[in-house]
């Protein structure tokens, strides 16, 4: 897998945003939380992830390159809020009242759980399966489990075992 190069100006914009919201939080909370580590190794359709114990934020490089400033403005404070909530309150619901409070009252940004970025470029290939009543799209992970005989999947409507038909031409 090749690594995408994130232009230095975009990395600087990420860090500027991170530092802005971290400063807001430290002032509001009366704390001196350190700057989290940022890396650009998030894969799939997730825009970002917060690694609580290592105080690290992973950002999706493809979605960052495609969406630039809107991505930074939405995803960086979202993931930072997860880290701050963990430091402030310990283990709580990921998008619970503490996280919403951190987003809205401390960081002063809307508390949105999911992003609305176009994900066609990062969506994984799916595999068509069918039962008696409909078609189903399985991820490559589930498809491979079927091929190895580790799992079988059944339709929630009719209960029939799903049968492989074709690969989706994504």
Curated annotation (Swiss-Prot):
Keyword Aminoacyl-tRNA synthetase: no
Keyword Lyase: no
Principal location: cytoplasm
Binding positions for Zn(2+) per the UniProt entry: 78, 82
Localization terms from the record: Cytoplasm
Domain called SprT-like: residue spans: 22-165
Molecular function in Gene Ontology: zinc ion binding
Catalytic machinery residues: 79
Cofactor dependence: Zn(2+)
Record InterPro entries: SprT-like_domain, SprT_Zn_ribbon, Uncharacterised_SprT
Keywords: Cytoplasm, Metal-binding, Zinc
One GO biological process term: response to stress
Cofactor binding notes: Binds 1 zinc ion.
GO cellular component: cytoplasm
Similarity comment: family membership: Belongs to the SprT family.
Name of the molecule in the record: Protein SprT
